[in-house]
UniProtKB/Swiss-Prot annotation:
<keyword id="KW-0964">Secreted</keyword>
<keyword id="KW-0325">Glycoprotein</keyword>
<comment type="function">
    <text>Hirudin is a potent thrombin-specific protease inhibitor. It forms a stable non-covalent complex with alpha-thrombin, thereby abolishing its ability to cleave fibrinogen.</text>
</comment>
<dbReference type="InterPro" id="IPR011061">
    <property type="entry name" value="Hirudin/antistatin"/>
</dbReference>
<dbReference type="Pfam" id="PF00713">
    <property type="entry name" value="Hirudin"/>
</dbReference>
<protein>
    <recommendedName>
        <fullName>Hirudin-3B</fullName>
    </recommendedName>
</protein>
<feature type="disulfide bond">
    <location>
        <begin position="22"/>
        <end position="39"/>
    </location>
</feature>
<dbReference type="InterPro" id="IPR024793">
    <property type="entry name" value="Hirudin"/>
</dbReference>
<dbReference type="GO" id="GO:0004867">
    <property type="term" value="F:serine-type endopeptidase inhibitor activity"/>
</dbReference>
<feature type="region of interest" description="Interaction with thrombin active site">
    <location>
        <begin position="1"/>
        <end position="3"/>
    </location>
</feature>
<keyword id="KW-1015">Disulfide bond</keyword>
<feature type="glycosylation site" description="O-linked (GalNAc...) threonine">
    <location>
        <position position="45"/>
    </location>
</feature>
<comment type="similarity">
    <text>Belongs to the protease inhibitor I14 (hirudin) family.</text>
</comment>
<keyword id="KW-0722">Serine protease inhibitor</keyword>
<dbReference type="GO" id="GO:0005576">
    <property type="term" value="C:extracellular region"/>
</dbReference>
<dbReference type="InterPro" id="IPR000429">
    <property type="entry name" value="Prot_inh_hirudin"/>
</dbReference>
<feature type="compositionally biased region" description="Acidic residues">
    <location>
        <begin position="55"/>
        <end position="65"/>
    </location>
</feature>
Amino acid sequence: VVYTDCTESGQNLCLCQDSNVCGQGNKCILGSNGEKNQCVTGEGTPKPQSHNDGDFEEIPEEYLQ
């Protein structure tokens, strides 16, 4: 399973993880209806502090190729 930190606005396949916020002045928008996750400019989104099952969605393998 691969997770990508949100760091830059417009970055695809970002997942808000670990701690702090999603990049500097960016927030993570979770994709829906087949859309990829993206970092967008906006107030930072707090990342989950725990790493329990279900905290993060897996990135579909077709996005990793």
